[in-house]
Amino acid sequence: MKLLLTTLLLLFNLTLFAQSNGFAGDYSRNFSKEGDHFIEYKLTLRQDGTFVFHSYSKIKNGIPPEVNKYGKGKWTAKDNVITFLSNKQEDFDAKYTLDFNNSKARFVTKNPRDKSARIIKTKLTFVESEIFWVQRLDIFKI
């Protein structure tokens, strides 16, 4: 009886972990104007609950003309809201300087019950962030 119960419990746990939530993956967004500027945001949400963010901007006549900014930390999901957390001791160094603590993003995708032909790209929309230029940023899944 114990063996049967243990086997059922193990199978139940394996099926829980086998179902992916669809949040993890690579997200990207580009803004550009021919010859004047180029801005790119990249976000990678890993299955293990960590993330890496990279912002690159190349602005003509900008000071400095090229800027790279990085951030990393952990993420959690509840319903369709992803919360980003950064640990000051582990996630910050000379390269990773962006503080994503208390940042939240909404996961937006087409509802499976929506049978219309309209196309809705899967994206994250940042709804809260202490980084002012991240607030209200849409970043699309690749």
Where are these regions (language model features)?
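Short, conserved beta-turn/loop elements at beta-strand boundaries and strand-helix junctions
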Residues: 78-82
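Bacterial Sec-dependent N-terminal signal peptides
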Residues: 1-24
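Lipid interaction determinants
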Residues: 19-72, 85-142
